[in-house]
C-alpha cells in the first residue's frame, strides 16, 4: 500500500512538471552550489562536497538523494567554476542532474558579489515497466517513454563577507511536460513555473569562543505556498556547531557540524516530522562531507560562518 500511494503521488507530480526534483537540504549554507550557481568559487579554494539524504526513514520507496560537487576560483579569482552531479530517486522515478557552474565575481566593499549560471542536462528515468498494471496494454503506460535527456539551467547571484551572506537564485528553471499524443517531452519556459530561492544569514560573536548564526531559506513557486526554513546554529571555538531548524511544513531539524581541521568538515542532521503524517513517514537523515584543498585564511573568504 505504501508503494502504491507513493507511486500515485509521484506520478501525479511528474505528469504536471518533469525535471523539477529540486534539492532539499538542511545544510544549504555549506552546500549552496546545489541551489545557487553563484556559490562557485566562494570557498576561495578548490572545494569538494559529498551529500547524502535519506528521507522518510521506514517508508518504502521514499525519496533519496546523493550529490557530488566540486568548485574553485580561477583566473585571478574573478571566475568561479564548478561541477555538480545530483541523483534523486522517488519510488519508480529517478532523475540525475549534470551541471557545469560558472560565476563571475567582483569585490564589493568588505565582501564579494557573484553572478552565476549553471547549464547541463537532466537524465530522467522511470520504472513504468516495474508496475503491476491491471491491463499491461494500458495506453498511459505504453505511451510513456522510460527515459529522456533534458536541458537544465540555473541562475543566481550571491554576496558574502566573513560575517554574513545573501543570495537569490532560480534553480532548474526549465520544466518539461509529456505530450500524451506524441509520447515525447516538450520544453516549457514560463515565469509561472519558476522556483525562486532567497537565502541569508549572519554570524554574531557572543564571546571569543561562541558564535550564533541565524539564517533563512525562502522558497517560492507561484502555484504553491511559500516555504521557509528558519535556522539557528551555535558554534564553539569554530570547531563544533549545534543547531535547530524549523521548516514551514511542521518539520523540526536537529543538526551538528564538526570542523576536524582547517580543511575537513562533517555535518549531520535529522528531520522530525511533527505533522499528523509524521508517524507514518518517519524522520530523515542527512550527511554532508566537505573538504577544502589548499585552504588560505588570509583571503576575504573562506567565510567564518
Outline where the language-model segments fall.
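Absolute protein N-terminus
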Residues: 1, 19-20
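Positively charged n-region of N-terminal signal peptides that target proteins for export
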Residues: 1-4, 108-109
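Subset of outer-membrane beta-barrel
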Residues: 20-305
Amino acid at each position: 500500500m505504501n508503494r502504491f500511494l507513493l507511486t500515485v503521488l509521484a506520478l501525479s507530480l511528474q505528469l504536471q512538471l518533469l525535471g523539477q526534483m529540486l534539492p532539499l537540504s538542511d545544510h544549504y549554507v555549506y552546500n549552496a552550489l546545489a541551489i545557487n550557481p553563484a556559490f562557485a568559487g566562494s570557498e576561495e579554494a578548490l572545494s569538494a562536497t559529498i551529500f547524502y539524504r535519506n528521507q522518510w526513514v521506514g517508508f518504502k520507496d521514499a525519496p533519496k538523494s546523493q550529490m557530488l560537487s566540486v568548485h574553485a576560483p580561477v583566473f585571478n579569482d574573478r571566475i568561479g567554476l564548478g561541477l555538480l552531479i545530483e541523483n534523486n530517486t522517488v519510488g519508480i522515478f529517478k532523475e540525475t542532474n549534470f551541471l557545469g557552474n560558472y560565476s563571475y565575481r567582483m569585490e564589493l566593499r568588505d565582501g564579494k558579489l557573484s553572478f552565476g549560471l549553471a547549464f547541463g542536462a537532466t537524465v530522467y528515468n522511470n520504472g513504468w515497466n516495474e508496475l503491476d498494471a491491471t491491463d499491461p496494454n494500458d495506453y498511459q503506460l505504453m505511451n510513456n517513454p522510460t527515459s529522456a535527456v533534458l536541458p537544465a539551467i540555473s541562475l543566481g547571484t550571491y554576496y558574502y563577507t566573513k560575517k554574513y551572506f545573501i543570495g537569490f537564485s532560480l534553480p532548474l528553471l526549465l520544466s518539461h511536460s509529456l505530450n500524451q499524443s506524441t509520447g515525447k517531452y516538450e520544453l516549457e519556459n514560463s515565469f509561472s513555473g519558476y522556483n525562486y530561492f532567497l537565502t541569508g544569514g549572519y554570524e554574531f560573536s557572543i564571546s571569543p569562543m561562541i558564535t550564533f548564526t541565524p539564517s533563512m531559506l525562502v522558497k517560492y513557486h507561484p502555484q504553491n505556498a511559500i516555504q521557509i526554513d528558519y535556522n539557528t546554529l551555535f558554534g564553539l571555538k569554530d570547531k563544533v556547531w549545534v543547531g535547530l531548524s524549523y521548516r514551514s511544513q511542521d518539520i523540526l531539524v536537529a543538526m551538528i557540524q564538526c570542523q576536524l581541521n582547517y580543511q575537513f568538515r562533517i555535518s549531520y542532521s535529522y528531520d522530525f516530522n511533527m505533522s499528523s503524517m509524521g508517524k507514518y513517514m518517519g524522520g530523515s537523515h542527512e550527511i554532508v562531507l566537505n573538504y577544502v584543498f589548499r585552504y588560505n585564511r588570509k583571503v576575504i573568504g573562506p567565510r567564518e560562518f
